[in-house]
């Protein structure tokens, strides 16, 4: 590889710096964000509707409860089906011809986001039914989640930590296992590949650091405002730019992948803490309905980037909070020096009266419960609110907008199949597609036995790198370089009710695959 822009952009050091900076930036914005201390009810666009639809605001009547449960179950089922066949196969596969969504790749992530979309749609259908009744206004589904902003932001911080840590670890794991940069980190790679070093380190570091992170975040054991003592306090503009750069870094992690934007290379990314690059879950009860064996198959790469896009949702919500932040909407007010104060008095938060949510009123009135001024019971933050206009704050989205445009540009021009290009599974990998037959079906096959079974070798799809072996019992597609007499013999001697072929990296027919 020549030392051009791509060489340095995708260099191991560049990738690891970006991956670990995202972790630091997410902790920093959580600490600086005044919304993290707000006692008001959390609201998240779209996701809040889905959460409220499934978890709370259930009417008292049994019939209404059953109706609500049936609707969100139907929404989930519709989302899964539409995500698989409409969005993944039709839109991404056939219409847009995206290589990264070839075959069944990326289907579970598509189905997840499709499910969120249909939960949002069905929540509005449910609201329409409630409005038709006329007396159910209290149960209308909105983007308010029924939990405090403080609690939600703590959950989001733990979630982003888990997602960012797994992502950073997978990037590190890939850098230390693969060899596009053979002269980089030779000693570290030698240590990393010894025995179970990478497995042991992952689980040890994950358990230890996650325990510390959860303890610090949930118990407020460490107060950021007491720790930094107002050193370089942030305002809504700087926080908006920080949130924007977090979005940029999330996209950079994907764009720095050596196989971006097609993800069709021969690099298998091992799942963190495991020896395998993919996970498979057998669904045995489907065998009674279908004649084939179905498995859920998730590859390490889609496991990694699926997590990134989940974290991206939380980061987008963080950016939204900074752009449209108004102190009184979050039970906060501005004191001397443009510092933010958080109201913790539940009585003052009932109606969010702007008169009571002010420095003048709270510093001159006494709380009868404590016999102290209201200000003394409020939380002081070093974060500032300078009242910047929306136009200025929206400038922070420019870096993210540029990143999204470049992301889409590379996918559109370099990550799509040509109209006449065959869209087949990655030819660099061996795979197996086995058609199972029940014993009753075999008994009807005119006395076919192992002794008189015939096998034929064909050239599938006119591709010399693959060899297709057909017999009366199964169909196997091998990479030609992997085919040996032992492989052929073991497959033909396998029982029809046995598990899938034993060749690495062969897999049974899987639907869907990520």
UniProtKB/Swiss-Prot annotation:
Belongs to the TMEM117 family. Pfam families: TMEM117. It is found in: Cell membrane. Residues 1-15, 87-110, 176-198, 261-295, 416-514 are cytoplasmic. Residues 438-448 have a biased composition (Basic and acidic residues). The chain crosses the membrane at residues 16-36, 66-86, 111-131, 155-175, 199-219, 240-260, 296-316, 395-415. Residues 37-65, 132-154, 220-239, 317-394 are extracellular. GO terms for biological process: intrinsic apoptotic signaling pathway in response to endoplasmic reticulum stress. It is a multi-pass membrane protein. Residues 429-459, 486-514 are annotated as: Disordered. One of its GO terms (cellular component) is endoplasmic reticulum. Keywords: Cell membrane, Glycoprotein, Membrane, Phosphoprotein, Transmembrane, Transmembrane helix. This is Transmembrane protein 117. Changing residue 353 to A: Reduced N-glycosylation. Loss of N-glycosylation. InterPro entries: TMEM117. The modification Phosphothreonine is found at residue 453. Glycans are attached at residues 353, 371. Involved in endoplasmic reticulum (ER) stress-induced cell death pathway. Signal peptide: none annotated.
């Amino acid at each position: 590889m020549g030392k051009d822009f791509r060489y340095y952009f995708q260099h191991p050091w560049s990738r690891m710096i970006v991956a670990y900076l995202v972790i630091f930036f997410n902790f920093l914005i959580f600490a600086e964000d005044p919304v993290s201390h707000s006692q008001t009810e959390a609201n998240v666009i779209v996701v809040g509707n889905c959460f409220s639809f499934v978890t709370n605001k259930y009417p008292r009547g049994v019939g209404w409860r059953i109706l609500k449960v049936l609707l969100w179950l139907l929404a989930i089922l519709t989302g899964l089906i539409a995500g698989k066949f409409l969005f993944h196969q039709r839109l991404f596969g056939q219409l847009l011809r995206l290589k990264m969504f070839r075959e069944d790749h990326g289907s579970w992530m598509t189905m997840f986001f499709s499910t969120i979309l249909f939960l949002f749609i069905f929540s509005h259908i449910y609201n329409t039914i409630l409005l038709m009744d006329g007396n159910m206004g209290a149960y209308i589904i909105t983007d308010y989640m029924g939990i405090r902003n403080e609690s939600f932001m703590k959950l989001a911080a733990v979630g982003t930590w888990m997602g960012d840590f797994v992502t950073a670890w997978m990037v590190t794991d890939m850098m230390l296992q693969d060899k596009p940069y053979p002269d980089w980190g030779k000693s570290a790679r030698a240590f990393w590949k010894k025995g179970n070093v990478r497995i042991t380190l992952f689980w040890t570091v994950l358990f230890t650091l996650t325990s510390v992170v959860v303890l610090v975040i949930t118990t407020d054991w460490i107060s950021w405002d007491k720790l930094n003592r107002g050193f370089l306090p942030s305002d809504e503009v700087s926080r908006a730019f920080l949130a924007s750069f977090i979005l940029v870094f999330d996209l950079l992690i994907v764009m720095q992948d050596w196989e971006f934007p097609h993800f069709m290379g021969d690099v298998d990314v091992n799942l963190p803490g495991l020896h395998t690059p993919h996970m498979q879950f057998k669904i045995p009860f489907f065998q009674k309905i279908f004649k084939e064996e179905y498995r859920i198959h998730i590859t390490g790469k889609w496991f990694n980037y699926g997590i990134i896009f989940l974290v991206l949702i939380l980061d987008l919500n963080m950016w939204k909070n900074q752009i449209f932040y108004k102190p009184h909407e979050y039970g906060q007010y501005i004191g001397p020096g443009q510092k933010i104060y958080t109201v913790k008095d539940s009585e003052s938060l009932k109606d969010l009266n702007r008169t009571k949510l002010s420095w003048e009123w709270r510093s001159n009135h006494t709380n009868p419960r404590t016999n102290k001024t209201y200000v003394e019971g409020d939380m002081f933050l070093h974060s500032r609110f300078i009242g910047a206009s929306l136009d200025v704050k929206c400038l922070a989205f420019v870096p993210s907008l540029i990143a999204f445009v470049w992301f889409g540009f590379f996918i559109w021009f370099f990550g799509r199949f040509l109209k006449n290009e065959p869209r087949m599974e990655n030819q660099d990998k061996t795979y197996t597609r086995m058609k199972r037959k029940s014993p009753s079906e075999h008994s009807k096959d005119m006395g076919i036995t192992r002794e008189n079974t015939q096998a034929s070798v064909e050239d599938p799809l006119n591709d010399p790198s693959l060899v297709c072996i057909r017999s009366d019992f199964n169909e196997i597609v091998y990479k030609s370089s992997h085919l040996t007499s032992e492989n052929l013999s073991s497959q033909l001697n396998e029982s029809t009710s046995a598990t899938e072929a034993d060749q690495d990296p062969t897999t049974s027919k899987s639907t869907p695959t990520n």
